């Protein structure tokens, strides 16, 4: 019994000792404070930005278009009476003088046989025919007399075939055309061309169609012909007053 008490007392002391150790350990655990970590502020981040591009220069202001210069309307020229046609008469070329043949040389005289008598040998007769005199040039006076009587005939004849273009009449176009044409001895128009335009293509075409339709003019006098033809330059008037 005593031994049992002694063991019980020993076990009780050991239990008390173990409990005391655990109590001390619990107290130390509770009083132990873990140092809190100090949070440092985040480091400042330096970001280097590229410089902004320079703004593009503004485009130059567009120049305002200049208004077109006002077109001055020129008044229509006053039509004057058509001048009389000029007829070109070429002067006939002067005939060239034929070269004269060389004069025959005289043969030397034979030696004299006797002093009292002399023998003279005549030169042989020349076989060259006598030179013909140049033909007289045609008289200019006769041409000038025949010119006034014929110069208006081609113009009057061609005027019968003249047509005023309808589009030119509507647009009020007027003008004077100068027509150059060559006529043979029979009055046939050999060639023609404009010597001076009126400034209107329609009137120019009408003049060329006029002489193309006519084809012929009155026969010219023979004394006006040069190598069988005569050249005429004549004006043709297109006027709204005359139609």
Curated annotation (Swiss-Prot):
Subunit structure of this chain's protein: Homodimer. Forms a complex with the accessory proteins ExbB and ExbD.
Organism the protein comes from: Pseudomonas putida
Single biological process term from Gene Ontology: protein transport
Protein name as catalogued: Protein TonB
Membrane protein topology class: Single-pass membrane protein
Purpose of the protein: Interacts with outer membrane receptor proteins that carry out high-affinity binding and energy dependent uptake into the periplasmic space of specific substrates. It could act to transduce energy from the cytoplasmic membrane to specific energy-requiring processes in the outer membrane, resulting in the release into the periplasm of ligands bound by these outer membrane proteins.
Domain of life: Bacteria
Ranges per topology, Periplasmic: 33-243
Comp. bias regions, Basic and acidic residues: 103-112
Cytoplasmic topological domain: 1-12
Ranges of biased composition (kind: Pro residues): 54-70
Low complexity composition-biased segments: 71-91, 129-148
Lineage: Bacteria, Pseudomonadati, Pseudomonadota, Gammaproteobacteria, Pseudomonadales
Cellular component terms (Gene Ontology): plasma membrane protein complex
